[in-house]
Amino acid sequence: MESFVDEVAIEVFAGHGGAGSVHFRREKYVEFGGPDGGDGGTGGNVIIRPNLSMYTLDKYLSKRKFKAEAGFPGVGDNCSGKKGEDLILFVPLGTQIYDEETGDLLFDFVTDTQEFVVARGGRGGKGNTHFKSSTNQTPRFAQPGEEGEYKFLRLSLKLLADVGIVGLPNAGKSTLISKITDAHPKIAGYAFTTLSPNLGVVKRRGDIFRFTIADIPGIIEGASMGIGLGLSFLRHIERVKGILYLFDASSLDIEEDLKMLRNELFTYNPELLNRPYLIVLNKIDIWDDPEFTKDIISKIIHLGKVIAISADKETNLEKLLEAMDEAFFKDEIEKVLKSTKELKSVSLNESDILGSFENSREIKE
């Protein structure tokens, strides 16, 4: 099983340019041919691209240095050397590229069509053809190729999830994500079972609309300061559109728990408190008393919209998904439904036209 690695430092070296050639024409009946040394080829670039099948940076643990191919040297007859082959490195979507020495953010992969030339190959050296002059008809020197660029990089992965599940340890985050997506996280009845984020895809409206959801390891008071599993995973909810605050319904003080969680998010990144959210009470199956559940909800309804569920028994999961549709994706779903309706309308019109054509042909025949 691959380990979840979301940060790693690597070194990349673009290819050196090829050397220019020192060469002279050698032809029959031409005793003193002029210079015809070709230029060296450009060194290969180091290019980074996203890969949708990657979810972790673990492949960069065993190898930390990467070098592109050098340009080939020039040859005679003014032929340039071949360009060095580019080196392509793949990273998960959501990876940010930092200069490890300056701390500057160089690139942020947010779509799968992007690519980033992080280090450019050196230019090839000029062949001796370029150095012929009135005072030097037979130059016996050429330029060496330039060195390729070098970069010391930090790759930092921030999951591109649409929804983040935040809660205390053992609130049932992994169980919930396993029930509403195809993800299969480790599930157990003890705190900190989840040691790394889990990502799943939720399919809605007959699979015409999808969104991604991530659960991160349980947050305890002081997480933003490094306590517990600390802030190492909080960055994975920085890009989310909405947050589910998930609680064990048997908690003694859900209001205080919510305040603590939101305070930790605020300490880490105040912007997170501006995201729309839902409050989810999990494990309502531990008592078979709807009135008791209603009583708990009545005490916290002033904090936000509350949905009571049992992830384990799959109780009210559709109700939760509908609430997420409304709170986080209402405009997007409306656009998708409108587009689908228009496509169906066009398809029906085409069928009518084809039917009219067939009927017309039958009448003529």
UniProtKB/Swiss-Prot annotation:
Domain Obg: 2-160
Chain residues that bind GTP: 167-174, 192-196, 215-218, 282-285, 310-312
Keywords, comma-separated and alphabetical: Cytoplasm, GTP-binding, Hydrolase, Magnesium, Metal-binding, Nucleotide-binding
CDD domains on file: Obg (cd01898)
Principal EC category: hydrolase
GO cellular component, one term: cytoplasm
Gene Ontology MF, one: magnesium ion binding
Main localization category: cytoplasm
E.C. no: 3.6.5.-
Sequence positions that bind Mg(2+): S174, T194
Presence of the UniProt keyword Hydrolase in the record: yes
Any GO BP annotation: ribosome biogenesis
InterPro entries, alphabetized: G_OBG, GTP-bd, GTP-bd_Obg/CgtA, GTP1-OBG_CS, GTP1_OBG_dom, GTP1_OBG_dom_sf, OBG_GTPase, P-loop_NTPase
Subcellular compartments: Cytoplasm
Superkingdom of origin: Bacteria
Residues covered by the OBG-type G domain: 161-329
Cofactor(s) the record lists: Mg(2+)
First and last residue of the signal peptide: none
HAMAP family linked: GTPase_Obg (MF_01454)
Assembly, per entry: Monomer.
Role noted for this protein: An essential GTPase which binds GTP, GDP and possibly (p)ppGpp with moderate affinity, with high nucleotide exchange rates and a fairly low GTP hydrolysis rate. Plays a role in control of the cell cycle, stress response, ribosome biogenesis and in those bacteria that undergo differentiation, in morphogenesis control.
Family under the similarity heading: Belongs to the TRAFAC class OBG-HflX-like GTPase superfamily. OBG GTPase family.
Protein name, UniProt field: GTPase Obg
Species assigned in the record: Leptospira borgpetersenii serovar Hardjo-bovis (strain JB197)
High-level lineage: Bacteria, Pseudomonadati, Spirochaetota, Spirochaetia, Leptospirales
Gene: obg
